[in-house]
């Protein structure tokens, strides 16, 4: 399978697309300095303990203290002896949201020693260009090619890759055309923001994010058998969860089927597709009302949220 990254500057927005065999499977967007802060390493100070969670509150210079859960303390046994005022080296694992604090971890992706006389909060790693934060999650496994349609962004990314991922420099290309349209980003964005998605064989999905979770309804729309529609829908659901970066609780309402065998076949198809596209998404099974329940831990904003932030 060929993996490639396309980076497009369009209308003041910076877009990144991960493509597998020429199909856009993931999208990310940012504007100016609004890129994700995930991966930043900080010398931080513990400003509070929440044993009921269990977690510690950590000052990294944001308006609200970040959350360091006991599971993210290294070693885990150290959580019991953490004290308010203690300094720790952490890495940002989840961006802050309007209603939630940033999540941090002591399990660093790379080793950095704190300065001898450092005073928290203090960033320890070198600030990366916005484009680096945009595509960092897609660099392992290494992509076969990275195309950029903006010369300044190309130069920033080339310098960053030389310092951090020198093996990827050879695959970096300065595109001579606007990639937002030509690489399929525009079409993928339109699809990812649509509440109704047509299935190739007939029928469609209705995808509705709500305050309680994401609801997905499958409509046959044709005289095709329920099983045929549901099997196609199961694969499409997995692709859409990945493309839209959906998370939290999700309910999928498949077209009604006749027996347990058909339901088992659809569930197995869904599980296989999820394992390929979003392996961190759990299948909880059929509910008593005949829906399939899924859950995926939130690690980053959904694509719709990222686009809204980039356009704010």
Describe the role of every protein-language-model region.
Residues 1-312:
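Single-stranded RNA-binding surfaces
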């Amino acid at each position: 399978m060929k993996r490639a990254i396309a980076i497009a500057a369009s209308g003041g927005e910076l877009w990144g697309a991960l493509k597998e065999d020429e199909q856009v499977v993931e999208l990310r967007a940012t504007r100016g300095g609004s890129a994700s802060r995930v991966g930043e390493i900080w010398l931080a100070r513990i400003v509070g303990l929440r044993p009921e969670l269990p977690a510690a509150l950590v000052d990294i210079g944001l308006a609200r203290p970040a959350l360091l859960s006991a599971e993210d303390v290294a070693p885990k046994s150290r959580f019991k002896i953490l004290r308010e005022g203690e300094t720790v080296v952490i890495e940002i694992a989840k961006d802050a949201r309007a209603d939630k604090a940033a999540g941090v971890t002591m399990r660093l992706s790379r080793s950095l020693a704190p300065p001898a006389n450092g005073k928290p909060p203090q960033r320890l790693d070198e600030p990366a260009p916005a484009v680096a934060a945009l595509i960092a999650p897609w660099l392992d496994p290494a992509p076969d090619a990275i195309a950029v349609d903006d010369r300044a962004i190309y130069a920033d990314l080339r310098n960053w890759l030389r310092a951090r991922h020198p093996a990827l420099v050879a695959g970096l290309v300065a595109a001579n055309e606007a990639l937002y349209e030509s690489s399929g980003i525009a079409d993928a964005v339109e699809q990812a923001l649509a509440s109704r998605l047509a299935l190739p064989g007939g029928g469609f999905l209705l995808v509705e994010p709500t305050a309680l979770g994401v609801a997905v309804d499958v409509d046959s729309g044709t005289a095709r058998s329920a099983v045929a529609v549901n099997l196609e829908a199961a694969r499409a659901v997995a692709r859409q969860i990945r493309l839209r970066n959906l998370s939290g609780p999700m309910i999928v309402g498949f077209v009604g089927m006749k027996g347990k065998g058909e339901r088992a076949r659809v569930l197995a198809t869904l599980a296989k597709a999820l394992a390929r596209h979003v392996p961190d998404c759990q299948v909880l099974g059929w509910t008593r009302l005949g829906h399939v329940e899924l859950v995926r831990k939130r690690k980053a904003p959904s694509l719709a949220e990222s686009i809204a932030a980039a356009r704010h």
